[in-house]
């Protein structure tokens, strides 16, 4: 009996499936772009395209290079504006879609956009946290940063909209950590380390739940 070569059809099938997946992702990106420009303006569309280009070009980079690219992108693309001036409320956590759309945001919006972009780039959730801190003089106010743990026992690196350079938390004596969280849990931060995990996790953070609900609608 003549043996059939099934390898070639399998390869073609895989290529076809990959092409369908790529086409679906492009269609979704086009839908998001159209939605963004309709809701905001053409400048919002330019920011969205630049964000997609950032993701495409950074996929194969080492993790610490991804941190630099993402940190620099949002620190340059978004201007700081308080929630009171931006949304007319004391505190509001914008989705990346809203942040890119308006091109303005406060410290939470910078940090959230960086966190979800790094997740999109494949950085594991256990290495990332959104960290509430107290920023000391000259700011003397509550502040949020995105932090990255190279290893479970190392000091986290701080991605901050106030300081352009990414530095270890041990070098940021101007920041006093309060608590941190990600998609997996919530921690009290008594020191510049991992902190003590809180029972109930992020289910205790109503703002986080609201943010995720709105992100589901944005599909971003």
List the predicted regions and their residue ranges:
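A structural boundary/capping signal
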Residues: 22-220
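Bacterial N-terminal signal peptides
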Residues: 9-17
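Bacterial N-terminal signal peptides that target proteins for export
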Residues: 1-9
